[in-house]
Amino acid sequence: MSWINRIFSKSPSSSTRKANVPEGVWTKCTSCEQVLYSEELKRNLYVCPKCGHHMRIDARERLLKLLDEGSSQEIAADLEPKDILKFKDLKKYKDRINAAQKETGEKDALITMTGTLYDMPIVVAASNFAFMGGSMGSVVGAKFVKAAEKAMEMNCPFVCFSASGGARMQEALFSLMQMAKTSAVLAQMREKGVPFISVLADPTLGGVSASFAMLGDLNIAEPKALIGFAGPRVIEQTVREKLPEGFQRSEFLLEKGAIDMIVKRSEMRQTLASVLSKLTNQPSPFVEPELISEDE
């Protein structure tokens, strides 16, 4: 090594500059890999301004951005999961719960609230994918049922945002039972004529897609969301065939009639308000343009 190389090898330039950038200031888009300013991304509801990719968004933040400011009130916030089976795989289930709670600041994978949307009363729920993949266990099922019962009590619509890998395997049959439990309460809602809208975000899979997520009076999806029971890789390995382009993405499902609408996150609030006003026979929160006759 020459003397000049030795001097430059000791220079703190690159490593120091890198260390001086606070963590979390920049975020790389998981689709186009553009480096984005995190605050701008947050203002854009975690949708990449370069390519339009819908990244995962925190469940609580999603609901607070949806509801009218100051109108939210959480439902069943005290419910916490318990390791009834003393389940252990690579780690103890209770250790996984503790780690997820520490990482997310939430007690489980579903957040439920009441509030208003353009002054319309509404009950909302959202899966937190960061909490054990948004998996559905006993607490998720119980909170979903309590939210649905609250909607029937208030006679107002219920909107649920799903982003889940499916049933929580660490709870075995207790988690599978939630599929029947959540489906049963939605049947009660239907009998009472209370609207339920399901919004499917990326990903919505397994026992969640096989139960409440696909049982909406209206099933809406975010763009390019992965929706299905088993994932595409598992299906390819099982059938040993190449799957069609875009298989299990929301655009593919809309084309095949499995969902009703695809709505961008930036347009979700207005779209839901417009749809719910029609379903509940209330005046539209938006000013409709007046039709001008040719005589005027």
From Swiss-Prot:
Gene3D superfamilies: 2-enoyl-CoA Hydratase, Chain A, domain 1
Record's GO cellular component terms: acetate CoA-transferase complex
GO BP: fatty acid biosynthetic process; malonyl-CoA biosynthetic process
One Pfam family from the record: Carboxyl_trans
EC assignment: 2.1.3.15
Domain CoA carboxyltransferase N-terminal: 25-294
Role played: Component of the acetyl coenzyme A carboxylase (ACC) complex. Biotin carboxylase (BC) catalyzes the carboxylation of biotin on its carrier protein (BCCP) and then the CO(2) group is transferred by the transcarboxylase to acetyl-CoA to form malonyl-CoA.
Name of protein: Acetyl-coenzyme A carboxylase carboxyl transferase subunit beta
Protein species of origin: Haemophilus influenzae (strain PittEE)
Highest classification ranks of the organism: Bacteria, Pseudomonadati, Pseudomonadota, Gammaproteobacteria, Pasteurellales
